[in-house]
Amino acid sequence: MSGTTHHHATFPAVEAAAFTRRHLDDLAAGLLGTVRVPGFFGRPALDTMLTSLHRVPVVSFDLDRMHHPMARFGTALNDYRTPELALDADRYWHDADTARRQWAGIGMTPDPLELALDALGRAWGVRPAPATIGGRPAFVGMLREVNDGTFIHYDDINREYRGGLFDQKIVAQLAFNAWLAAPREGGTTTVWRHRWEPADENRRHGYGFQPTAVADDPYVTVAPAAGDALLFNANNYHVVHPGAPGQRRIALACFLGVTAGGELVVWS
């Protein structure tokens, strides 16, 4: 059952029929906690997508890094980061090209990624293009299954990769999720109005942070529902809570980057 609660008026949760440019601007500026669009994927489209889901090949995230079991289709840039905060380029491009070929072969119709990019393009005014690395487009369109939750963490391409990795300068990073399957209980996402600060390094927990890092901060909690979509600022600390045992939580996931030139780019 989907729903949203927000803890503080200065960190509001918005529910809308569609994403808008104002939503994207306000999330980038830190004025909103989350924006959720119920029924982002209509029921007939969602039912058709689900008939193809069994053909999607998945691999596990790096358990040494993530600690929780998670499955994914497609490439997640953080799984290709070297200890020197650089990209393991040969491995990344091989896997990204393989995933693109596999996705084309699955023939999921309608294509959830195309539906998402079209909707985000209507919101921004121009359909977002993939971020590029040395002129090559990054992979977009990861499907991710997270049933057992995550640690509290944030995402920031400018911190994760020395120099920011992309040809474009990213000045704001948003997280996009659209659920193809969701548990009836649990599996909620909580986003805090909290950005990284040096004192947080004393509250490290694996790749993320202890709950004490955000104990006094306003937050939003969103319960997933199949077909719904969610946007929030990825620089804010956030967590996925475990879902009910035996129930799947599968989402199309990517990041949106607002560039210094005022463009919108995407990657996974």
Swiss-Prot record:
Per the UniProt entry, the Enzyme Commission number(s) are 1.14.11.-
- Oxidoreductase recorded as keyword: yes
Which top EC class is named for this enzyme in its record?
A: oxidoreductase
User: Which cofactors is this protein said to need?
Assistant: Fe(2+)
> Under which pathway is this protein filed?
Amino-acid metabolism; Antibiotic biosynthesis
InterPro entries, alphabetized: WelO5-like (IPR055091)
List the Pfam families.
WelO5
Annotated knockout phenotype? Cells lacking this gene still produce L-propargylglycine but not L-beta-ethynylserine, that are terminal alkyne-containing amino acids produced by wild-type S.cattleya.
Report the protein's function: Involved in the biosynthesis of terminal alkyne-containing amino acids such as L-beta-ethynylserine, that are produced as antibiotics by S.cattleya. Catalyzes the hydroxylation of the dipeptide L-gamma-glutamyl-L-propargylglycine, leading to L-gamma-glutamyl-L-beta-ethynylserine. Cannot use L-propargylglycine as substrate.
Q: What is this protein called?
A: L-gamma-glutamyl-L-propargylglycine hydroxylase
Provenance organism: Streptantibioticus cattleyicolor (strain ATCC 35852 / DSM 46488 / JCM 4925 / NBRC 14057 / NRRL 8057) (Streptomyces cattleya)
